[in-house]
């Protein structure tokens, strides 16, 4: 399997990397969050820009990014506009979604960009090309807040993401039972054994919390923890998360 190196973080080896979302609505709130995150043991910061109140002004988005980067100069930043259809805060046109992501990837000031799988393939490929030209890695994602698809479907989506050029394919699904969590873990194990790229998977809510902890066993390269406000159901406090990941890593 290829390793994916972003600044001082290597995906695809050792314990899953911890990503903590920033969900501030204003520049002031984001600066406060970034300063707090400086004090926390994390690997990646995800800027959930769909929470940012000036997201439609691209100059203001870049200015906010500059403020975050000043406070967190060495921390990998994952730039994510989560669409409303995949559980995000704001509904926007497909045109704006791609304009925003291409513009910010084109600055080279972010380290990773989230690209949702279920969009026009030509748009997705163009965004991946822009990202890679600017040394920005692509987390290609899919989120199902209603259910856990069949194992074959989860495997198919992750495999398709890699085929399209994702550096880190990602899927998050909602369990209705413990069996659904096993389905997600089984799919993760199957894909990670044959994939060229590290993958990121999770089963959400309380039922799925084991999937956020067991990535090193089953093959998920990153997990999401909450420092302030969880951006998805089931995210664990980042300090507790690190403790458990370290414990499992020592035994593995």
From Swiss-Prot:
The entry's keywords: Amino-acid biosynthesis, Aromatic amino acid biosynthesis, Lyase, Schiff base
Pathway this chain belongs to: Metabolic intermediate biosynthesis; chorismate biosynthesis; chorismate from D-erythrose 4-phosphate and phosphoenolpyruvate: step 3/7
Gene3D superfamilies, sorted: Aldolase class I
A single GO BP: aromatic amino acid family biosynthetic process
Listed EC numbers: 4.2.1.10
Active site: 143 (proton donor/acceptor), 170 (schiff-base intermediate with substrate)
InterPro entries reported in the protein's UniProt record: 3-dehydroquinate_DH_AS, Aldolase_TIM, DHquinase_I, Type-I_3-dehydroquinase
Molecular function GO labels: 3-dehydroquinate dehydratase activity
Extent of the signal sequence: none
Disulfide bond positions: none
Superkingdom of origin organism: Bacteria
Reactions listed under catalytic activity: 3-dehydroquinate = 3-dehydroshikimate + H2O
Pfam families: DHquinase_I
Residues the entry annotates as binding 3-dehydroquinate: 46-48, 82, 212, 231, 235
Family classification: Belongs to the type-I 3-dehydroquinase family.
Function, in words: Involved in the third step of the chorismate pathway, which leads to the biosynthesis of aromatic amino acids. Catalyzes the cis-dehydration of 3-dehydroquinate (DHQ) and introduces the first double bond of the aromatic ring to yield 3-dehydroshikimate.
Oligomeric and partner information: Homodimer.
This protein's name: 3-dehydroquinate dehydratase
Lineage: Bacteria, Bacillati, Bacillota, Bacilli, Bacillales
């Amino acid at each position: 399997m290829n390793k994916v190196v972003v600044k001082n973080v290597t995906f695809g080896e050792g314990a899953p990397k911890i990503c903590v979302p920033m969900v501030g609505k204003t520049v002031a709130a984001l600066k406060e969050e970034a300063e707090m995150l400086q004090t926390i043991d994390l690997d990646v910061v995800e800027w959930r820009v769909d929470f940012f109140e000036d997201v439609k002004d691209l100059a203001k988005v870049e200015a906010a990014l500059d403020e975050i980067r000043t406070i967190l100069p060495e921390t990998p930043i994952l730039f994510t506009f989560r669409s409303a259809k995949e559980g995000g805060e704001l509904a926007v046109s497909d045109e704006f979604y791609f304009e925003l992501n291409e513009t910010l990837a084109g600055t080279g000031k972010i380290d990773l960009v989230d690209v949702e799988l279920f969009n026009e393939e030509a748009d997705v490929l163009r965004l991946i090309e822009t990202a890679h030209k600017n040394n920005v890695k692509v987390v290609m994602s899919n989120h199902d807040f209603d259910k856990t698809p069949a194992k074959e479907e989860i495997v198919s989506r992750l495999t398709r993401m890699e085929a399209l050029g994702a550096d880190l394919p990602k899927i998050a699904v909602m369990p209705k039972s413990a069996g659904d969590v096993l389905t997600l873990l089984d799919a993760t194990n199957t894909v990670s054994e044959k994939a060229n790229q590290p993958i990121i998977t999770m089963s959400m809510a309380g039922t799925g919390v084991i999937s956020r902890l067991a990535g090193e066993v089953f093959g998920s390269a990153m997990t999401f923890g909450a420092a302030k406000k969880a951006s998805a159901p089931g995210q664990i406090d980042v300090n507790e998360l690190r403790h458990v990941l370290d414990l499992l890593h020592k035994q593995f």
